[in-house]
């Protein structure tokens, strides 16, 4: 057992490995010794890792070279790569596997470059996970597949080309060392399989990155699917009443007044949406008996003044130009069909079927409603002849008696026109007064 002083373990390791290392790469050792000298001489370290990498990036660009003392390339020939972190100079001296293939006289300006490089790059290696290479490979494939649809990608996320695995260790690491372009340049120069590194914007924090999807397209499509599903769920809840009202309104256009059956005659659009219009062809078919299998009795009410009616009217039409006469004719003794499967219909017309005919039709319906309990009616099926007698006469003159047409404003009947107008206005005023009195009585009666 030797009695001499035992040298420290670090010195002994250096003594054993130094000769073999100097015999292989003397100049590389000189470069490493120069780096160790920079460790001892410099005492004021940068304040943050971000500032260190910023200085390192500038030195790398000015020198035109790339340091090659951070990655183990001994297994590149077999397609594998060692991801063990190299954090101390002792580890580099022990394995000695970083070989430089460039010129040996290439020097980097700045003595603190190696210190910054060794403090910046290992952070990335420590943050990596075993599937980091596969993750980067998947991102490269996704970028190639979506390169043809760049206009669909949000421009605010273009700075995020690759996102590191979200492990707890990664979230705790500062974002400064990952923002330097030095690592990407070095990996590309060395031919490392890890050719894509994160380029995070300075304004984006790591906590915010956790809420961003790896693929902006996937995020937007997922959001759209979720929104579409929520909308499909919300529509029946919010618009159910509106949809039902629309269906009822569209269906009510085809139903008769008591909503029990569909209109037996084909209807056409008219001036007043609340009324049902039929064409002159339908009236002609009605007169010829084409609907007798479903209609037991029909009435054609000519609402024009008597001189107009006598000047020419539809065969079988009744001249009832006042509401009082109309109510007495139909409501004093309502007409009920003998066959419950058949119907009783009423067709109203005037010269143009614009004012007088629709007004008489509404008057009969209002009075009928008042005499029955909703929705029951004596006469649920009322129609208006579209275009009136003026449109019917030229097409079906043979169905008119006499075969002539006397307009309301005929110059030979001016006095009669004034007389009938005054009477109709008086009757209309009396009807409105009676309606107001009925409302007052209804409001004053106890509930």
Swiss-Prot record:
The active site is at residue 350. SUPFAM superfamilies: Rhodanese/Cell cycle control phosphatase. Spleen and thymus. The keyword Hydrolase applies. It is found in: Nucleus. The modification Phosphothreonine is found at residues 66, 129. It catalyses: O-phospho-L-tyrosyl-[protein] + H2O = L-tyrosyl-[protein] + phosphate. The modification N-acetylserine is found at residue 2. GO terms for cellular component: cytoplasm; cytosol; mitochondrial intermembrane space; nuclear speck; nucleus. One of its GO terms (biological process) is positive regulation of cell cycle G2/M phase transition. The modification Phosphoserine is found at residues 20, 38, 56, 60, 63, 128, 192, 213, 220, 445. The keyword Nucleus applies. Keywords: Acetylation, Cell cycle, Cell division, Hydrolase, Mitosis, Nucleus, Phosphoprotein, Protein phosphatase. SMART domains: RHOD. Phosphorylated by PLK4. Phosphorylated by PLK1, leading to activate the phosphatase activity. Phosphorylated by CHEK1 and MAPKAPK2. This phosphorylation creates a binding site for 14-3-3 protein and inhibits the phosphatase activity. Phosphorylation by PLK3 at Ser-213 promotes nuclear translocation. Ser-220 is a minor phosphorylation site. Phosphorylation by CDK1 occurs at G2 and G2-M transition and leads to increased activity. Residues 81-90 have a biased composition (Polar residues). Functions as a dosage-dependent inducer in mitotic control. Tyrosine protein phosphatase required for progression of the cell cycle. When phosphorylated, highly effective in activating G2 cells into prophase. Directly dephosphorylates CDK1 and activates its kinase activity. Belongs to the MPI phosphatase family. Interacts with MAPK14 and 14-3-3 proteins. When phosphorylated on Ser-128 and/or Thr-129, interacts with PLK1. Interacts with MARK3/C-TAK1. This is M-phase inducer phosphatase 3.
């Amino acid at each position: 057992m030797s009695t001499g002083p035992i040298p420290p373990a670090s010195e002994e390791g250096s003594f054993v490995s130094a000769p073999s290392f100097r015999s292989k790469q003397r100049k590389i050792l000189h470069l490493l010794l120069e780096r160790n000298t920079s460790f001892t001489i410099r005492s004021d370290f940068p304040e943050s890792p971000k500032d260190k990498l910023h200085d390192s990036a500038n030195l790398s660009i000015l020198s035109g070279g790339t340091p090659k003392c951070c990655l183990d390339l001994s297994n590149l020939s077999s397609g594998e790569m060692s991801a063990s972190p190299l954090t101390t100079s002792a580890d580099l001296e022990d394995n000695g596997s970083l070989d430089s293939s460039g010129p040996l006289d290439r020097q980097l300006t700045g003595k603190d470059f190696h210190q910054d490089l060794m403090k910046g790059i290992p952070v990335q290696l420590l943050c990596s996970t075993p599937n980091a290479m596969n993750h980067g490979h998947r991102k490269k494939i996704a970028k190639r597949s979506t390169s043809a649809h760049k206009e669909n990608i949000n421009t605010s996320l273009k700075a995020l080309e690759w996102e590191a695995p979200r492990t707890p260790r990664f979230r705790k690491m500062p974002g400064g060392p990952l923002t330097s372009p030095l690592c990407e340049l070095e990996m590309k120069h060395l031919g490392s399989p890890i050719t894509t590194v994160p380029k995070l914007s300075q304004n984006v924090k790591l906590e915010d990155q956790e809420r961003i999807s790896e693929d902006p397209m996937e995020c937007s499509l997922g959001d759209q699917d979720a929104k579409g599903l929520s909308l499909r769920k919300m529509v029946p809840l919010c618009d159910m009443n509106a949809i039902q009202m629309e269906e009822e309104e569209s269906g009510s256009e085809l139903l008769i007044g008591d909503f029990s059956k569909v209109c037996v005659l084909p209807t056409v659009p008219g001036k007043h949406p609340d009324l049902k219009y039929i064409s002159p062809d339908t009236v002609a078919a009605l007169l010829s008996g084409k609907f007798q299998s479903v209609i037991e009795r029909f009435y054609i009410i000519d609402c024009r003044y008597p001189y107009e009616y006598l000047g020419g009217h539809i065969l079988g039409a009744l001249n009832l130009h006042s509401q009082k006469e109309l109510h007495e004719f139909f409501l004093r003794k309502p007409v009920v069909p003998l066959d419950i499967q058949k119907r009783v219909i009423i067709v109203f017309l005037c010269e143009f079927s614009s004012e007088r005919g629709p007004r008489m039709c509404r008057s009969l319906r209002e009075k009928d409603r008042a005499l029955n309990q909703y929705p029951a009616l004596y006469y649920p099926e009322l129609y208006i002849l579209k275009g009136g007698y003026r449109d019917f006469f030229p097409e079906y003159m043979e169905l008119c008696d006499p075969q002539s047409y006397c307009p309301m404003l005929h110059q030979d009947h001016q006095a009669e026109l004034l007389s009938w107008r005054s009477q109709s206005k008086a009757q209309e005023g009396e009807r409105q007064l009676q309606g107001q009195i009925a409302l007052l009585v209804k409001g004053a009666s106890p509930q």
